[in-house]
């Protein structure tokens, strides 16, 4: 391989260097987004935990016979699953992991399952496991606001109130740490009865109405918490994937540079040999 080979290797080096710049930049962006989303998750989690304490206190004052829709299931044979996926790719096995987990949960009862996807990537993945979606929500921001939460939650809640589904479950990739994310399913409705010692306190207008209003706020907070956790997992997966791609690019560049220098050395050695050979021939 002569100078033509060197030109080809230089072209490949330039191409890999361009790719490395892109993957490195995307990795840095994912790291920055993860930091911001984790901060928001921490704040929202505190809010969620405080509302949960209030719910427990209020629920202890309500009769077990209370027919609130939040506690009482209906007779529908259908269950609703909200699948949280990503809107963009390049995040490793993130979407495949969460969809595979959904498949493991509903494999034996797919005819009784209704699915809502959050994130554009979920739609195609869900079809691969033989499920259709009844609604799809896309372009969810990196830090979901109350607006996005309200749209999805109220759509699902209406189906539950109308008796179309007997359960609302959310399947997502739970954020544990930047290097660990676990697929998880959370049942949003119906809520299990909380058994605790009743506390005596005054509520206006009445405990039932206050509890229902508080539950609505609490469930939206829980849903937002789940979306934020899923977004953290997405950015972690993307950060890991891009860092891995950047490292692979570095390894390829090392091999190409080594190959380039070896060929260049061979060419120089050959040229020196030809010069020496020519000089010897003229003696």
UniProtKB/Swiss-Prot annotation:
UniProt keyword list: ATP synthesis, Cell membrane, CF(1), Hydrogen ion transport, Ion transport, Membrane, Transport
Subcellular localization(s) per the UniProt record: Cell membrane
Principal localisation: membrane
Lineage: superkingdom: Bacteria
Molecular function via GO: ATP binding; proton-transporting ATP synthase activity, rotational mechanism
Lipid bilayer topology: Peripheral membrane protein
Assembly, per entry: F-type ATPases have 2 components, CF(1) - the catalytic core - and CF(0) - the membrane proton channel. CF(1) has five subunits: alpha(3), beta(3), gamma(1), delta(1), epsilon(1). CF(0) has three main subunits: a, b and c.
Protein name: ATP synthase gamma chain
Native organism: Clostridium botulinum (strain Alaska E43 / Type E3)
